Regions:
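Charged, glycine-rich active-site and insertion segments that engage polyanionic ligands
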Residues: 1-49, 53-57, 65-68, 98, ...
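Clamp-loader machinery-focused feature within the broader ASCE/P-loop NTPase space
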Residues: 2-161
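Conserved catalytic/switch belt of AAA+ P-loop NTPases
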Residues: 140, 164-178
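Structural recognition of the conserved hydrophobic beta-strand(s) that form the central parallel beta-sheet
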Residues: 149-153, 166, 177-183
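Conserved strand-to-helix beginnings and helix N-cap segments that scaffold or border functional pockets
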Residues: 160-164, 286
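Residues immediately C-terminal
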Residues: 157-158, 172, 188
Length: 366
């Protein structure tokens, strides 16, 4: 056990170990990079190393602090447990009074966006005021072990008017506490928060690195490992947990929307395709948009790229080739701009169906 188990981004691991060895741990860090690249995993590992009873610059994984903190590595069951304890009928006031906090050790908290949707079924999970206030209070408590660590996953989801609560912690940092913010894009956070954090960017892994990880940690066949590595966009977490059959269906559904748009089908047929895509997928809407980017990248590569460069999804080469004959660079640019705008508006809890319909209409050939 230890940091040696972490795959990729060794420069970040080395920097964290150096901090622990020198006993110069910052009061706040910001981990940014693609979803599933290992930000949360390494944050939990750091919390283990900061409180390990046997080691100083690493963690053993066997002592009581390591084992208890390690339970945070799989947050989904803890989230379900927390929601069940709070009750399904919780109103907005209850959500603030009983904030969702994942805690398996007194000194380490994991704060994740609260999935309680209340009366809005399309609302994105966000960090709530109650969660931030709880962190502000607890950060000043003395640790029972060596260091208090607060992991804020999805830090970009906190409303900017609530960020001032968090900013006060950064302006008056406790001596024995470290806050680790996780966000896909650091610029989704206020500049005043970014400037007070030591920032680390987690780069996507290469396809070869992902295939090696999948070979060691999954039961995927060689062909499945290759496909998962190509579609994971450098994310080991996404590759290891990929439902290949579901991912294949999602890509077909996305391609169907683009096919109907470029073929000039009726708006009724186009909207049927977008409705099927939004309602029929178990994945997050953000992931659906990412698949749009992947398919469009393959279209661009097939139409204008090198012929010997592999597609991300070679199984759809024939269908992609048919679409390529009906598009140009202007269409590709318009598609990317529309997806970028839709992705940016997700923070405002817009209607996803209407947003995707608008993008599809803008791409329709008439």
């Amino acid at each position: 056990m230890g940091f040696a188990e972490f795959a990729g981004n060794q420069r970040v691991v080395t920097a964290l170990q150096g901090m622990l060895t020198a006993d110069r741990v910052p009061h706040a860090m910001l981990f940014s990079g693609p979803r599933g690249v290992g930000k949360y995993t390494l944050a939990v590992m750091f919390a283990q190393a900061a409180n390990c009873a046997r080691r100083k610059d690493d963690f053993c994984g066997e002592c009581e602090p390591c084992r208890r903190i390690g339970l945070l590595a799989e947050p989904a069951p803890l989230v379900e447990q927390g929601l069940a304890q709070r009750g399904e009928s919780a109103d907005a006031a209850m959500v603030e009074r009983v904030p969702l906090i994942l805690q398996t050790h007194p000194d380490v908290w994991s704060i994740v966006p609260d999935p309680m949707r209340l009366r809005n079924p399309v609302a994105r999970p966000v960090l709530h005021m109650g969660q931030l206030r709880a962190v502000a209070r607890a950060a000043n408590f003395k640790p029972t072990a060596r260091r208090r660590v607060f992991i804020l996953d999805g830090a970009e989801t906190m409303r900017w008017d609530l960020a001032n609560i968090f900013l006060k912690i950064l302006e008056e940092p406790p001596e024995s506490a470290t806050l680790i913010l996780l966000a896909p894009n650091p610029y989704l956070l206020l500049s005043t928060i970014r400037s007070r954090c030591l920032q680390f960017y987690f780069a996507p892994l290469s396809t070869e690195q992902l295939e090696e990880i999948l070979k060691r940690r999954t039961q995927f066949k060689p062909s499945e490992r290759k496909l998962a590595a190509q579609l994971a966009e450098g994310s080991p977490g996404r590759a290891m947990h990929m439902d290949l059959e579901g991912a294949a269906q999602l890509r077909r559904d996305v391609l169907q929307v683009l096919e109907r748009a470029v073929e000039g089908r009726s708006y009724a047929q186009l909207f049927d395709a977008t409705a099927q895509l939004v309602k029929g997928q178990k994945e997050s809407f953000e992931n659906v948009l990412e698949v749009f980017y992947i398919v469009i990248t393959d279209l661009l590569e097939l139409a204008y790229g090198s012929t010997d460069r592999p597609l991300r999804d070679p199984a759809l080469r024939q269908e992609l080739g048919a679409v390529c004959k009906k598009i140009d660079l202007e269409w590709v640019a318009q598609a990317v701009d529309g997806l970028d705008e839709l992705h940016g508006r997700l923070r405002r809890n817009i209607n996803r169906q209407l947003g995707l319909d608008a993008v599809a209409i803008s791409l329709a050939r008439r």
